[in-house]
Every structure is written in structure tokens, then in C-alpha cells.
Design a protein with these regions (language model features):
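N-terminal, polar/charged subdomain of small-to-medium soluble alpha/beta proteins
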Residues: 1-77
Length: 77
């Protein structure tokens, strides 16, 4: 699992998502996910949407994932 694989999974699952994923070791990842689909969602709900897109990979291939989830408007602020 690498940053690109995670990006593809998130973009495929969350409509209109713009995703940037980085990692120094392909085990610990940091993701910025921007989506209009996060509108009116709590932080927990947003993170759950991302975790759901990664499925069982969160239990096996991804040791840690730091998330920053934003709507397009929040990203401009």
C-alpha cells in the first residue's frame, strides 16, 4: 500500500473528493481530503467516510492515518 493507492481508494469512494496523501514510510500516512460531500457532516462522520473507503486496509496495511477533512469552502478560509 502506498500513498497513490490510498488516494485512488478515497477518490473512488467519496464523490468529487480532491485528495493529497503523503508518507515517509508507506505505513504512516497523512491525508488531506476536500469534498463537498463533507458539508453538514461532523468531524467524526467525515473521518468515518474516509475510513469506510479504505475498508479492511485500515486493519492490515495502514498502521496510522492522520486526516484533515474539509469542504471546498473551508479549504479557502
Amino acid at each position: 500500500m502506498n500513498s497513490y493507492d490510498i488516494k485512488v481508494l478515497i477518490e473512488a469512494s467519496i464523490e468529487d473528493a480532491v485528495v493529497n496523501v503523503s508518507s515517509d514510510d508507506n505505513v504512516h500516512f497523512e491525508a488531506i481530503v476536500i469534498s463537498q460531500g463533507f458539508q453538514e457532516k461532523s468531524l467524526v462522520q467525515r473521518h468515518q467516510m474516509v475510513y469506510d473507503s479504505l475498508g479492511d486496509k485500515m486493519q492490515s496495511e495502514i498502521h496510522a492515518l492522520s486526516l484533515n477533512t474539509l469542504t471546498p469552502k473551508e479549504n479557502l478560509e
